[in-house]
């Protein structure tokens, strides 16, 4: 019998790298609200007392960058010097320039469907049927732990009012013959106010954060819990560590279970295939698994800058396919348009929905209907996490001629 351990981690919305991601995506959202043709590549750095927002942006929109940055920081919970960082008083430095016209000439075309990729690169998408979210279980549970930490922290009259925004989680699972059999270890580190006794913190975190999230069927007497194992975690957020956009690409995707092309997501408009093609690859892989064509599926796509058609599409199902990987690849080419314009249209990506992707994972989330007012004051309806739909599974299954 094959037995092995696998570990994934996640971080909270108050982790400094995630603060940076959320600022970058808030800038993108604010611009897309007014200008759907904008080109945005926004990078953020946060450190004690300052947020630096830089990058290349070409747009007709105007946004109050300073006010927007401050709002993101305070909404996360960094709203006082008592927590070490205050969005109301920190410095905000604007270092934004315009996108190179040489890139623009390769992307923008007279015919929208001929739109070229914004850069070269390779992207991966993955799905598995081991969880209802079609995500690997370790990253799924790691996200839910830090999400629960934030939920309890922000709750009115919270029993854990001493929680602070910064937190990290890690889950180690035991697999037997490729199937999750148990949770071997859990790590939960959370920033907290001074004066909290370690014993009280451990008990509260276990009862209010860990127990509501982890499946009881996978817990056993030997499961190890490491809660704030250093003893104190009072200094956190941008004071404890410098935060940068794009530093949590494994947390953002599949927790190390699938391969990664190296490109980050946050702060990039959908013309950047680092983001849009990774979303499309997840959409494809999830529909393949939801269709029952495989238990696990990884899809790779690649692009050349200024070229519309992908330079490659490849599929691997790790021996779990009900039909051959070659046949699945042919079905993908038939049912999905993976040119940049095709992806944007297929997933309806040009809407202000990206800040909510910047914490707790870009994948494994439920599609969410919402509406907003655009630059003309019109109400627009849209769907966030559209790449999590399984609306093409039935057609794939029928075309594969599976009963």
From Swiss-Prot:
Q: Which residues bind Mg(2+)?
A: 17
Catalysis performed (reactions) = L-methionine + ATP + H2O = S-adenosyl-L-methionine + phosphate + diphosphate
Q: Where does L-methionine bind?
A: 56, 99, 241, 272
| Metabolic or biological pathway | Amino-acid biosynthesis; S-adenosyl-L-methionine biosynthesis; S-adenosyl-L-methionine from L-methionine: step 1/1
What EC number(s) does this enzyme carry? 2.5.1.6
Give the residues the record marks as binding K(+): 43
Q: What is its main location?
A: cytoplasm
Question: What cellular-component terms does GO give this entry?
Answer: cytoplasm
Record's keyword annotation contains Magnesium: yes
Enzyme class, broadest EC rank: transferase
Cystine links in this protein are none
Q: Which GO terms describe its molecular function?
A: ATP binding; magnesium ion binding; methionine adenosyltransferase activity
Q: What does the note under cofactor report?
A: Binds 2 divalent ions per subunit. Binds 1 potassium ion per subunit.
Region: Flexible loop, residue numbers: 99-109
- Cellular localisation: Cytoplasm
Residue numbers binding ATP? 15, 166-168, 232-233, 241, 247-248, 264, 268
Q: Which co-factor is required?
A: Mg(2+); K(+)
- Which UniProt keyword terms apply here? ATP-binding, Cytoplasm, Magnesium, Metal-binding, Nucleotide-binding, One-carbon metabolism, Potassium, Transferase
Q: Which parts form a coiled-coil structure per UniProt?
A: none
One Pfam family, short name = S-AdoMet_synt_M
UniProt function note = Catalyzes the formation of S-adenosylmethionine (AdoMet) from methionine and ATP. The overall synthetic reaction is composed of two sequential steps, AdoMet formation and the subsequent tripolyphosphate hydrolysis which occurs prior to release of AdoMet from the enzyme.
Membership in a protein family? Belongs to the AdoMet synthase family.
For this entry, the protein name equals S-adenosylmethionine synthase
Taxonomic source organism = Stenotrophomonas maltophilia (strain K279a)
